[in-house]
Structures are given as C-alpha cells and as structure tokens.
C-alpha cells in the first residue's frame, strides 16, 4: 500500500494488473536513490535503481513520484532507470549506460 501526503486520505495499491499478459514475468526495484544498476534475467525485486535485461517477456518496473523514469533500449536489450536528484548527482544515468553497453 502506498500512502500519499499530497492527497489527504489517499491510498494506492502497490500491485500490477497483469490479467491479459500471458507468460509475463516481472523484475522490479527496491529503489533507494542509489547509483546501482543491474543486468537481470529472472523475475524478482532487486535492490537497485536501474534494471537491464536481454530476456523477452521479462517486464521491468520502475516507480516514480517526483523522480524521473528513463527507458533505454537497443535491438537486444531494454533498461529502466529511476533517477532522483541523488542518483543524478552520483551519475546513475552514465553508470547504467556503461553497464548497458
């Protein structure tokens, strides 16, 4: 459950509606405003602020409020990055691009 201090008494379920997505696996992040990105090929929740995968049917999930979600891709890989001011200051975008290549 996610609570908002911007909208009084608001509650949002932390879940994914995957009813129509057969055979889809999910990799999500326990985001901590770090400069860490990981390449993954299995579903799960990873302590990172960037995910990269070559695996088809592995959905990468990023959650944002006032941070910036970034998607990167080429013919073989896809990646997502959660960038807040701290991650930006610690060069997570640059480090994830290096990890991506």
Language model regions located:
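Active-site microenvironment for binding and transforming phosphate-containing groups
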Residues: 1-101
């Amino acid at each position: 459950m996610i609570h908002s201090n911007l909208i009084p008494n608001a509650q949002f379920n932390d879940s994914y509606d995957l009813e129509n997505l057969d055979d889809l696996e999910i990799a999500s992040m326990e985001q901590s405003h770090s400069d860490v990105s990981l390449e993954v090929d299995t579903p799960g929740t990873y302590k990172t602020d960037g995910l990269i995968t070559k695996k088809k049917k592995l959905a990468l999930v990023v959650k944002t409020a006032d941070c910036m979600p970034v998607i990167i891709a080429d013919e073989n890989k896809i990646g997502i990055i959660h960038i807040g001011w701290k991650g930006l200051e610690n060069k997570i975008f640059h480090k994830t691009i290096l990890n991506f290549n």
